[in-house]
Amino acid sequence: MFRHAFSKSSPAFLAGGSAIGGAIAGLMWSGERNTSSSTACDSSEPSNQSVIGLLQELSRKVNNLESLVGGNPGSFPARSTSSVTKSGTQYGIDIVLGAQWGDEGKGKLVDLLSQDYDVCARVAGGSNAGHTIVVQGKKYKFHLLPSGVLNPNATCVIGNGVVIHIPSFLNELDSLEASGVDYQGRVYISDRAHLVFDFHQEVDGRQEDRLGRHKIGTTKKGIGPAYSSKINRNGLRVGDLQNWDHFERRFRELCTHHERSYEGLKIDVDNQLAFYKTVAERVNSMTIDTIDYTNKQFEAGKRILVEGANATMLDIDFGTYPYVTSSNPSVGSVLTGLGVSPGKLRGIYGTVKAYCTRVGEGPFPTELPLDEGTPGEHLSQVGAEYGTTTGRTRRCGWLDIPQMKYSALINGFTSINLTKVDVFTGMPEVKIGKAYLHNGKYLSSMPASLDVLSNVGVEYEVLPGWSEDISNCKKFEELPENCQKYILRVQELLGIPIRWIGVGPNRADVIDRGEGWDLATAGTNQ
């Protein structure tokens, strides 16, 4: 836990810097001394041996430094990115991200964590995202709102990186209010967030239909076309509604542009404008400069939680392009979609389903058939694998370690939230995809080529399953032995602490190992 609090201004950091500096200086001095005493006739072997010895000495010094700053040199070196207020209080922005292809269970962890946070934020995507939260047997479905809205003491921020379809957003608020949740005065929208219009959604559907069997598999929520308008610099932002004449002029121009670009597209401009004029006051009452607000909340020492949407493998840059979303659901979106600096980030929590699922098209190396009586059917049926947004049946497969390592490399996860472990109950065996092979050779990195990724072989490790119900387990040691072995093996393969373990669908069905659980304490009760 000391590492999480480790500050650049601390004595340990200064001492550590001196230790590293001394080790490097010693290495340089020794190298110079050995060089000056050698001759052209000296063989290379003694020189190589001396370099090895020097490197070993440097390694020992670095290990000593690790012990100094971390307390336990055998523990997993968690990142220390928390900031310190003038009063000495440590704080930072924590992030929950999807580590696979989405639908990992991010919303549940956000709901669990958000009870202790002051601000919950969304930073990317739009109503194509979907989170389902179960509280006291009651289901709440979120698409644009952060799941943290269920915490009555938290304010919710929709950042500038999100694209917002106002009708869907207002319907979501009305549905929430009808469920007895009071959101008034707690939901803020960035004035810089771009708008999704109905014609964006129609264009989205047309583009998918035009692609035929090569379709991307989008949700047809207009996300891609809205981001296209943003990049083309002709889009409208939420803040534009604060100046009606400006909004009306720009909206008419955008409609004309789309009607000229898409044959047969007809937009009822006057009807659309009438709707936005009706809701403008309501939207404007929630519209603020969220960049200024969020940073001021940070400086005031407020705890901030970012809820990621979609997932890394759907990232426009890092995902299985072109079968991706149109935004960056990886860690970079927190900076660009909320307007905060990197030094303000603290915990980066990767949410990983115990098996893989995917909605839509694209490569899926560990995919299983969903035929009756197969492991794939078990995962699909027991896991209720149907999209929150689309209702489509999700594709299912075994956990994919190469994909997970790639995701961890990009995001720098400090802890893992392993969800839906309970779905494995009743399976005689479970598998973990350990490595990719292509043309008989192991791949050392995630291939960018879809042709390669679609044709990789997967090397699996088979572990025994379990039959016991784990939904009532509250501690790690209460889990069946085979379940524990599975979790520990995944942790070992990833090299990242698994802090949270999902054992059921309800809000409380989570084992939290606590912040101090690292690789050195695996298998012990914290």
Curated annotation (Swiss-Prot):
Localization per record: Cytoplasm
Domain of life: Eukaryota
Binding residues for substrate: 388-394
CDD domains found in the cross-reference section: AdSS (cd03108)
Recorded metabolic or biological pathway in which this protein acts: Purine metabolism; AMP biosynthesis via de novo pathway; AMP from IMP: step 1/2
Positions contributing to Mg(2+) binding: 103, 130
Active-site residues annotated for this sequence: 103, 131
UniProt name for this protein: Adenylosuccinate synthetase
Species this protein is from: Phaeodactylum tricornutum (strain CCAP 1055/1)
